[in-house]
């Protein structure tokens, strides 16, 4: 998860040889940092507008990765919890599955803004916006070390990386915590 989350906000190496560093453009952010409010319906609508305005195919699955505090912020709004606006009984379930076309993914691994540490950076993105590459799959070995009184030694490794493929399909949403 950390590799994918980092790829959403980090500079992406682009170009034929990957020699150009491309930051997430400011137009792909719903608001500036130093927010005074958490995740709101207005911020969700803004993220949807940014994706729609970029001509992102509406048939692509859209996701929103956010933390527990952002879920709590939305559970306090009528639009999310009322059956008049949402077919899922979010308040009864205590979670949000989907809203405004976004499927919600709750994660405690999201970073805070480096400058404004009271802001959690959440992201809206499409299913093809981030690519994960696995160079070497998981290798795990457990053995004993005779030179260490036959202590158990655990070896575990894998090689992977992720990057943004299309900036216009990722939206950063800073939320106050």
List each model region and its residues.
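Alpha-helical scaffold segments that mediate packing/assembly in large oligomeric complexes
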Residues: 1-53, 172-177
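Long, contiguous amphipathic alpha-helices that act as assembly "spine/axial" helices in icosahedral shell
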Residues: 1-20, 55-68, 104, 140-164
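Detector for Asparagine
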Residues: 9, 53-54, 86, 111
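Short, catalytically relevant binding-site loops at active-site mouths
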Residues: 13, 69-73, 110-112
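Sequence/fold signature of self-assembling virion shell proteins
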Residues: 25, 32-39, 77-177
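Hydrophobic, aromatic-enriched interface-forming segments
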Residues: 34-78
């Amino acid at each position: 998860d950390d590799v994918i989350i980092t790829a959403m906000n980090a500079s992406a190496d682009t170009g034929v040889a990957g020699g150009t560093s491309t930051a997430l453009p400011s137009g792909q952010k719903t608001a500036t940092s130093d927010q005074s409010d958490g995740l709101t319906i207005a911020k969700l609508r803004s993220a949807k507008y940014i994706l729609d305005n970029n001509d992102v195919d509406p048939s692509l699955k859209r996701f929103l990765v956010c933390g527990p505090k952002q879920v709590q912020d939305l559970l306090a709004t009528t639009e999310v919890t009322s059956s008049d606006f949402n077919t899922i009984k979010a308040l009864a379930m205590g979670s949000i599955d989907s809203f405004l076309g976004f499927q919600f993914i709750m994660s405690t691994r999201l970073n805070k803004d480096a400058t404004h540490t009271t802001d959690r950076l959440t992201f809206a993105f499409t299913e093809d916006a981030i690519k994960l590459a696995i160079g070497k799959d998981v290798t795990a070995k457990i053995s004993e070390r005779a030179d260490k009184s036959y202590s158990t030694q655990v070896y575990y490794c894998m090689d992977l990386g992720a990057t943004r493929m299309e900036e216009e399909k990722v939206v950063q949403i800073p939320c106050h915590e």
